[in-house]
Regions:
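Glycine-rich ATP-binding loops of the HATPase_c
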Residues: 110-114
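Short, solvent-exposed loop/turn segments at the edges of secondary structure
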Residues: 106, 163-165, 324
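Glycine-rich phosphate-binding loop
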Residues: 89-108
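Interdomain "switch/hinge" adjacent to the Bergerat
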Residues: 1-6, 38, 42-93, 119-285, ...
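Conserved phosphate/pyrophosphate-binding and hydrolysis machinery centered on Walker-type P-loop NTPases
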Residues: 17, 21, 97, 489
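Charged regulatory segments coupled to nucleotide-binding catalytic modules in large multidomain enzymes
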Residues: 249-525
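Bergerat-fold GHKL ATPase/HATPase_c domain
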Residues: 1-51, 59, 74-81, 497-525
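Alpha-helical scaffold elements adjacent to nucleotide-binding pockets in ATP/GTP-utilizing enzyme cores
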Residues: 24-27, 75-82, 103-107, 187-191, ...
Length: 525
């Protein structure tokens, strides 16, 4: 008879997950399944159900507790020691392989499970010796079978409990130094805000539109009350998009609406649905915007990370494409089954069909959307640039602001070039507006960009003072900037003008203009 060795336990514990934070996800999904059953059985109200996480850095202890079903005493030991023998329904429940409960044992000295079932006056407890587990795995002279190994590192007992209590609790005692990250409350919260099945933040104004779409299409987003050290968690979606590093307040774009898509199999089954934000798509969204990218979820638990879809050429034509968007794809078909690591789905016919249908939107429609936005922005920008240069040119003419004739001719040539681009952009805008009239998504993008480039009167009208100054300059025969330096003679003005010309030749335009203006200001005193 074949014997399964100790290394199987290693593969299911210390070697199973690349990211230590996944232990939180594994225990949360088990608690969520239990809460669903408790609500269905009338044991707890949905509004009272809670998953409570407590992180105690000084004690090196993590506790994860739920007030759901609990486990009957007669089933407790078998359920908590049997491996990969879960009786859960994979089409209905989030955790179904019977291996997730082992996730924590490799990261602590002792992993403790406690539970009490409603109507029983006992608390069932089982302890897994994580330190001994690591010692045996590291000892090449010990070769116990997997079952003997489990028996050797587990210990169960019972305590008295109130018959009305019902809960399940996971305690990780003595979190090892190598796993300090698990005790970093801020980092844990940031991870769970992305991954866990929690509600949208109250300040995300489009959540009501998302919930309305779900109601109208017979869809449901699984959401649970999850706390970390007393603080309830929410998905940190925001409408404003920021630039720079964390803490920056520079707003570069804003979500103005959300769009929805549904994905169906060839036989009419709904495979998934998605929402994504509509903005001006000014630039790739920076990492400081926590929920950037289109995220993939099943039962509202994130599959993989923000790069799962973006890094795959199956879904995005360009690797950068995903970073222009904010949104989520919710897989709903029962055959879209998360793999053991929950970083993607198991390969099957439904997964293949899902990829084909999602690709049509991500690879084609979303690619077209942000490139379309770029074309529209460039066209409107060409008109804005021309208007700005025309105002600058007229102002310099009226105020004798050119350094010399060459400077004036260059500005005139630049203005003519800008005018040509602006004239060409009129046709581009007309064509893109036609596209917008045929596509609701592009229509929203077009109108948002058009509104942001609406000219202000102050940018296109020369002031009365400027006109008066121009008339005065004509009377005094002033054409160039240095002629305003009346305390210098013509020879000195000519020398200063030469310096200005050199600065314009060797410096970028903006810097040259700034330096010349500063020198002019100082010489005018």
């Amino acid at each position: 008879m074949a014997e399964i060795g100790k290394n199987v336990i290693e593969n299911l514990t210390t070697a199973m997950y690349e990211n230590a934070y996944t232990v939180y996800r594994e225990y949360i999904q088990n608690s969520a399944d239990s809460i669903d059953k408790a609500i269905a059985a009338g044991i707890v109200n949905e509004k009272d159900a809670i998953i409570d996480i407590n992180i105690e850095y000084n004690k090196r202890r993590i506790t994860i507790n739920d007030n759901a079903m609990g486990i009957p005493a007669e089933m407790f030991v078998k359920k908590l020691t049997d491996i990969a023998d879960s009786q859960k329904d994979r089409t209905k429940e989030k955790g179904f392989r019977g291996i997730g409960r082992l996730a924590g044992v490799g990261y602590c000295d002792t992993l403790i499970f406690k539970s009490s079932y409603k109507g029983e006056n006992v608390e069932s407890v089982i302890e897994w010796d994580g330190k001994k587990l690591r010692d045996v795995l590291a000892d090449t002279t010990q070769h116990p079978s997997a079952s003997d190994f489990v028996d050797d590192i587990t210990y169960s007992y019972q305590n008295e409990a109130n018959m009305d209590e019902h809960y399940f609790e996971v305690i990780m005692e003595g979190v090892i130094p190598e796993s300090d990250d698990l005790l970093d409350k801020v980092a844990v919260i940031e991870y769970l805000e992305s991954v866990a099945p929690i509600p949208f933040a109250t300040f995300f104004i489009y959540k009501s539109k998302i919930y309305e779409f779900c109601r109208n299409n017979n869809l449901k987003i699984d959401e649970y009350t999850i706390q970390v050290n007393g603080n309830q968690l929410f998905k940190p979606y925001k409408t404003k998009i920021y630039d720079g590093t964390s803490g920056s307040t520079k707003v570069v774009d804003e979500i103005k609406d959300v769009e929805f898509k549904e994905f169906y199999a060839s036989d009419g089954r709904r495979l998934a649905w998605m929402w994504f934000g509509i903005s001006k798509f000014e630039q790739q969204i920076k990492p400081m915007n926590k929920m950037r990218g289109i995220r993939l979820r099943k039962e509202n638990i994130q599959i993989g990370d923000e790069n799962t879809l973006g890094a795959s050429p199956k879904f995005f034509k360009e690797p950068r494409g995903n970073c222009y968007f904010v949104g989520e794809i919710y897989a709903v078909d029962s055959e879209l089954i998360p793999n053991a690591r929950r970083d993607y789905f198991k390969t099957n016919a439904t997964t293949k069909e899902f990829e084909v249908e999602v690709r049509k939107v991500l690879y084609n429609e979303l690619y077209k959307t942000y490139h379309y936005a770029n074309q529209v922005k460039k066209a409107f920008q060409s008109q804005t640039d021309y208007e700005r240069k025309a105002v600058e040119y007229d102002k310099k003419v009226s105020e004798a602001g050119f350094v010399d004739e060459r400077d004036k001719e260059k500005a005139k040539k630049d203005l003519e070039t800008a005018k040509e681009k602006a004239e060409k952009s009129v046709r581009t805008i007309e064509l893109r507006e036609q596209d917008a009239n045929e596509n609701t998504t592009l229509n929203r993008v077009f109108n948002e960009i058009k509104e942001s480039y609406r000219p202000e009167k102050s940018n296109t009208v020369i002031s009365v003072d400027s006109v008066k100054q121009e008339e005065k300059n004509k009377k005094e025969d002033k054409k160039y900037l240095t002629q305003n330096l009346s305390k210098y003679n013509k020879r000195e003005q000519k020398l200063i003008s030469k310096v200005y010309s050199i600065l314009q030749a060797i410096l970028p335009k903006d810097m040259a203009d700034m330096v010349v203006a500063k020198i002019q200001e100082e010489l005018s005193k």
